[in-house]
């Protein structure tokens, strides 16, 4: 695929280790040839596991290239919405903004689930006396939820940086800037 992209679009796609090993401050940059590079984390969560996956985006010549290790729910949801809603996305920047917006929605849903589970733990603790074993189970559950909450917050911070970068490089049109500001407000509402 890399060779095909190079031949078809004159673009050199980064290797996987180049995508993952960047410092936070080096995740957003513009090449001399006009390519815009963005590395953004996307959260993936199942009942069994949760993790972030770094995705590399390159905007070049009216196209958006993305590199990721695996399929993500946010990409599937974007494709579903684009098929069902004409003009949901009009250009490559809309696609990128919508992916970032969907990631915020996805994160908000997970945060809501965290608070629901923490509420159940609170009711257990406040509702009756507990044995040491039961208290240990509750404490362990709280620690798991707080760990998940911290990773979601870090993911949202990364999304905020990506949107801010897109707005700062003045690449977006007025409507897209409005969408970017709305994404930032949505992130702020989760703090």
Task: List each language-model region with its residue ranges.
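Peripheral, non-transmembrane regulatory/ligand-interaction domains of membrane transport proteins
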Residues: 1-185, 189
């Amino acid at each position: 695929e890399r060779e095909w992209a190079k031949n078809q679009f004159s673009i050199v796609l980064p290797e996987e280790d180049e995508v993952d090993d960047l410092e936070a401050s080096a995740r957003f940059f513009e090449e001399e040839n006009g390519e815009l590079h963005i590395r953004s984390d996307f959260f993936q969560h199942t009942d069994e596991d949760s993790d972030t996956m770094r995705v590399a985006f390159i905007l070049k010549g009216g196209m958006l290239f993305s590199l990721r290790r695996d399929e993500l729910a946010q990409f599937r949801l974007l494709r579903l919405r684009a098929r069902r809603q004409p003009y949901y996305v009009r250009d490559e920047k809309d696609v990128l903004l919508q992916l970032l917006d969907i990631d915020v929605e996805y994160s908000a849903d997970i945060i809501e689930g965290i608070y629901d589970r923490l509420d159940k733990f609170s009711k257990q603790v406040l509702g009756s006396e507990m044995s040491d074993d039961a208290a240990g189970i509750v404490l362990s559950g709280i620690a798991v939820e707080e760990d998940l909450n911290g990773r979601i917050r870090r993911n949202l911070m990364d999304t905020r940086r990506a949107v801010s970068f897109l707005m700062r490089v003045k690449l977006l049109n007025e409507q897209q800037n409005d969408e970017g500001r709305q994404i930032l407000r949505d992130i702020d509402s989760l703090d």
